[in-house]
């Protein structure tokens, strides 16, 4: 088969292969295509071949790999850059493009949306500068309001497992406290239920910036402008160091209940400036980022840091994922998303640096089921989807009209984000191969 193009003087013979199921497969035949074709041109060719076999086919964006590396330039430029011979028949693998196929209607808040969490497939959590946490069952549908903070919420975390009937959520706030809430996601369908915290966690001496839940257990960790990381129990029963408030209240759609206060079980000390972000991916390991330009890995049992990475910039966010959940991504006060691989001995330099943003990075998140994919959010108003196999973003989500303050994956195929435009945005239909 010969595919027409502007440059008829130079043709390359290729075979398109895929691991996708029908109807995405094309016949494994050699076709001749122009050497100056780009990714968009390759996508058009594959769509034309599929449409010739299936007239009802709807155009689908594709990405393309040669020897496991994504193509982000013309085919001829790619072959020259990689030293690949153009004389042989090239095998080009195609996958569904990692890009949103649908934008949901925005969910407006009363102030900046400073935190989002998509850990549960049943709902989305948001935290807002109005001091309220919110639970969204879908775009525009707020099922629960988590109330009680006197300052802006900076972070939200899902504490217990996704399949639990009653959900536990932790919120962190600029009022120096954390609050723990319990609610049933299925109980509120036609109205919004207000939920009061069952426990208030006090101990930080400055604004709390981040909260993360232990992957398996009943604890959360928090980070603060007071340069510390605190660990807390989330159980309802009181123990030494906890005091019970006898105050009870019954509000709108709210059951009467008591409220306890908790103190930190322990503190991790070592950072010298604001600890901007924490994640707790393993039972005994916590990672943190700080304005002191460092990323640290903490041993929960000893309370000491076992890894200390410096990048020369104040950091706002950190996450752990990728191959064997061993890669560390962080971003901060420059436009560069950095990725480290601490398994490589003798080096503390990032193994990847992605620099397509034009302002500070506010959030980064690894995809839970992919070794290659992660996202970043920035004050430039954009969210970028990345693949470690190319230096360019796979997709740029540009739906916010102000700074993006938070972002996360949801259900594996959506990105949820919040920003200074006071909106929760949902970008869905993202195909992760």
Swiss-Prot record:
Keyword presence, Secreted: no
Gene3D superfamilies cross-referenced by the UniProt entry: YVTN repeat-like/Quinoprotein amine dehydrogenase
Protein name: Ribosome biogenesis protein WDR12 homolog
InterPro entries: G-protein_beta_WD-40_rep, NLE, WD40/YVTN_repeat-like_dom_sf, WD40_repeat_CS, WD40_repeat_dom_sf, WD40_rpt, WDR12/Ytm1
Cellular component aspect of the GO annotation: Cul4-RING E3 ubiquitin ligase complex; nucleolus; nucleoplasm; plasmodesma; preribosome, large subunit precursor
A GO term, aspect molecular function: ribonucleoprotein complex binding
UniProt cross-references to SMART domains, sorted A to Z: WD40
SUPFAM superfamilies given in the database record: WD40 repeat-like
Family under the similarity heading: Belongs to the WD repeat WDR12/YTM1 family.
Location in or out of the cell: Nucleus, Nucleolus; Nucleus, Nucleoplasm
Chain's role: Required for maturation of ribosomal RNAs and formation of the large ribosomal subunit.
Modified residues (N-acetylmethionine): 1
GO biological process: maturation of 5.8S rRNA from tricistronic rRNA transcript (SSU-rRNA, 5.8S rRNA, LSU-rRNA); maturation of LSU-rRNA from tricistronic rRNA transcript (SSU-rRNA, 5.8S rRNA, LSU-rRNA)
Species annotation: Arabidopsis thaliana
Primary localization class, coarse: nucleus
Region (Ubiquitin-like (UBL) domain): 12-96
Ranges for the WD repeats: 108-146, 148-191, 203-242, 270-308, 310-350, 356-396, 399-433
């Amino acid at each position: 088969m010969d595919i027409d193009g502007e440059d008829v003087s130079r043709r390359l013979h290729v075979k398109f292969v895929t691991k996708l199921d029908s109807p995405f497969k094309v016949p494994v035949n050699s076709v001749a295509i122009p050497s100056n074709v780009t990714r968009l041109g390759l996508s058009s060719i594959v769509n034309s071949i599929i449409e010739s076999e299936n007239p009802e086919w709807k155009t689908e964006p594709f990405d393309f790999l040669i020897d496991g590396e994504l193509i982000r330039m013309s085919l001829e430029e790619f072959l020259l850059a990689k030293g690949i011979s153009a004389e042989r028949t090239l095998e080009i693998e195609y996958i569904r493009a990692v890009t949103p196929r649908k934008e949901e209607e925005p969910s407006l808040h009363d102030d900046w949306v400073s935190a989002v969490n998509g850990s549960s497939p049943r709902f989305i959590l948001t935290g807002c500068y109005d001091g309220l946490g919110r639970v969204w069952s879908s775009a525009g549908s707020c099922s629960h309001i988590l109330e009680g903070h006197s300052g802006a919420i900076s972070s939200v975390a899902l504490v217990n497992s996704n399949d639990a009937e009653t959900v536990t959520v932790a919120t962190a706030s600029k009022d120096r406290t954390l609050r723990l809430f319990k609610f049933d996601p299925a109980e509120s369908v036609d109205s919004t239920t207000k939920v009061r915290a069952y426990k208030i966690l006090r101990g930080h001496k400055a604004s709390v910036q981040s909260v993360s839940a232990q992957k398996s257990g009943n604890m959360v960790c928090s980070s603060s402008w007071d340069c510390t990381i605190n660990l807390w129990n989330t159980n309802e029963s009181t123990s030494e160091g906890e005091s019970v408030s006898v105050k009870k209240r019954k509000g709108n759609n709210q059951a009467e209940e008591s409220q306890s206060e908790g103190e930190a079980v322990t503190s991790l000390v070592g950072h010298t400036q604001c600890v901007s972000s924490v994640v707790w991916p393993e039972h005994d390991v916590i990672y943190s980022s700080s304005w002191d330009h460092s990323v640290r890995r903490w041993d929960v049992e000893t309370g000491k840091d076992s890894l200390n990475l410096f990048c020369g910039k104040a950091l706002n966010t950190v996450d752990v994922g990728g191959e064997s959940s061993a890669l560390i991504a962080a971003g901060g006060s420059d436009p560069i998303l950095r990725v480290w691989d601490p398994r490589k001995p003798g080096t503390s330099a990032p193994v990847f640096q992605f620099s397509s943003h034009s302002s500070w990075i506010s959030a980064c998140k690894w995809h839970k089921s992919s070794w290659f994919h992660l996202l970043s959010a920035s004050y430039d108003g954009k969210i970028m989807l990345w693949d470690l196999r190319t230096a360019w973003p796979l997709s740029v989500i540009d739906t916010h009209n102000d700074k993006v303050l938070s972002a996360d994956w949801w259900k594996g195929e959506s990105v949820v984000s919040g920003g200074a435009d006071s909106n929760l945005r949902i970008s869905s239909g993202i195909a992760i191969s």
